[in-house]
Amino acid sequence: MVNQHFENIISNKKNIFLRSWPSNNDPTYNIIIIHGLGEHSGRYKEFANFFMKKNIGVFSFDLIGHGKSDGLKGHISNIKDFTDSIEDVLIEVRRRYINTPIILFGHSLGGCLALNYLIERKSKEISLAIISSAWIETEIQIPKYLLIIQRVMHTLFPKVRLSNRLDTKDLSKDIKIVDKYKNDPLVHDRISLNLLSEINKTIKKIKNKDYNIEIPVLIIHGKKDKIISYKGSELIHKKIKNSKLKLYDNVYHEPHNDNERKEILEYYYDFIKNHKK
């Protein structure tokens, strides 16, 4: 097991909990992980261990309102706060490794946030991006009455939180992964009316706005994902010219945690090697 480092950085006057798996040597790349809704940075240990053995450093932080970072669980005032957190983590990684290329990895909500970051900030510091099961099109059927409540009430009661309606067995075919998730004290199932509104606005922008993401982007999704539809990944693949789409027929929502994860992590690594500067 590779040693982890823990610390807090400040973003918009909030503590952001940052985990890192630093390389003992000069890393060839550093990966910044943006996790999904309700989870946290600590769920990426196996991911990090795989890449550390390849001499690639890994940094994973808890989003505001998640894990050990500040904020009401499952709530945010503005999507910009997430974007600023990504930027501040990026600045910290760049401060430590001035010349090491950086890869942005985003899963589920994190995939949506990674795309939004690439669109909004147009950072020259990101060399590659890997987008996993991006929250663009949901498979979970949200009752119409809840959508109406959300639209009407989010301005009046932005911090009201509802269940995210996640069925944990849809995360992975690996029962051990599912059990760990269900018993993880840092995991929550909350989403506020305002966070849902901010996510929906961000998704609409990603779908409809014209943008040019120049860096190579790998988009990955499982066709058996019952939480987020792979159709959304197909859509963003068409919009991003320099992207590659990889669909897995039998993979669930978390490719990096499913039974095929060794194959999938090797695929990520091959993508990185093929774009080595």
Residue ranges and their predicted role:
Residues 1-25:
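N-terminal cap/lid segment of alpha/beta-hydrolase-fold proteins
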Residues 36-39, 223:
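Active-site glycine-rich loops that stabilize anionic/oxyanionic intermediates
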Residues 38-41, 67-97, 264:
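Catalytic nucleophile-loop/oxyanion-hole region of alpha/beta-hydrolase
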Residues 43, 48-72:
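Conserved alpha/beta-hydrolase
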Residues 101, 109-131, 137:
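Conserved hydrolase catalytic core segment
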Residues 213, 219-221, 225:
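Short beta-strand/loop motif that positions the catalytic acidic residue
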Residues 215, 229-238:
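Short alpha-helix in the alpha/beta-hydrolase fold that links the catalytic acid
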Residues 244-277:
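Catalytic active-site module of serine/aspartate enzymes centered on a nucleophile-bearing elbow/loop
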